[in-house]
């Protein structure tokens, strides 16, 4: 207000408060990722695609903007015979080469090396349901601040899974291996 950017006096009221919530940065274990991969989703094409796109994120540890657009132009074989995904990350412009593990190869084969078009909000919606169906329901303590006081409550892990969980899970599991 002092800078003349607005003239809203409500911000000075005692009733005005900032509500914050801590982000719970979970990751999925290899066994939880396998449980998601092993689900039979053949009766729901949209869930099947969302699951597969999410798994590509787990197997590559890339951002959604990078892993959701992988196509045959990104896939090549090194002189050693190793199949890799070769891409330039959209956010940073970094060039990365990612080894293709058998689980990732199966998904690439399923879609003839071109993942179906997917949208982050759709994958986020379905992946929570898919994680629940896979039995990923461990209780996680989530903390938040309300009226200046830190509070906690329990949430099922499946409800915290989102597209970025794939990247975090891939990176964490590679580190732990």
Name each region found by the language model:
Residues 24, 41-46, 86-95, 111-119, ...:
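Short, contiguous acidic/charged loop-to-helix segments that flank catalytic cores in large enzymes
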Residues 15, 69-107:
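Conserved tyrosine-mediated DNA breakage-rejoining catalytic core shared by Y-recombinases
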Residues 36, 41, 82-83, 173:
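Catalytic cores of nucleotide-enabled group-transfer and carboxylate-activating enzymes in metabolic
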Residues 5-64, 119-122, 167:
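Basic, Lys/Arg- and aromatic-enriched nucleic-acid-binding interface segment
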């Amino acid at each position: 207000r002092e800078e003349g950017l607005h003239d809203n006096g409500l911000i000075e009221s005692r009733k005005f408060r900032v509500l914050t919530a801590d982000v719970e940065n979970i990751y999925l274990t290899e066994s939880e990722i396998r449980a998601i991969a092993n689900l039979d989703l053949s009766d729901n094409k949209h869930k099947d695609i969302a699951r597969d796109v999410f798994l590509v994120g787990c197997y590559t540890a890339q951002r959604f903007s990078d892993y959701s657009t992988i196509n045959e132009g990104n896939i090549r074989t090194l002189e050693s015979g190793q199949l890799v995904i070769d891409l330039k990350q959209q956010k940073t412009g970094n060039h990365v080469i990612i080894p293709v593990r058998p689980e990732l190869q199966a998904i690439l084969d399923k879609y003839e090396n071109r993942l179906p078009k997917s949208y982050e909000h759709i994958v986020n919606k379905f992946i929570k349901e898919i994680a629940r169906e896979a039995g990923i329901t461990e209780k996680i303590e989530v903390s938040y601040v309300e009226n200046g006081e830190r509070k906690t409550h329990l949430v099922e892990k499946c409800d915290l899974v989102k597209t970025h969980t794939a990247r975090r899970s891939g990176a964490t599991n590679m580190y732990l291996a």
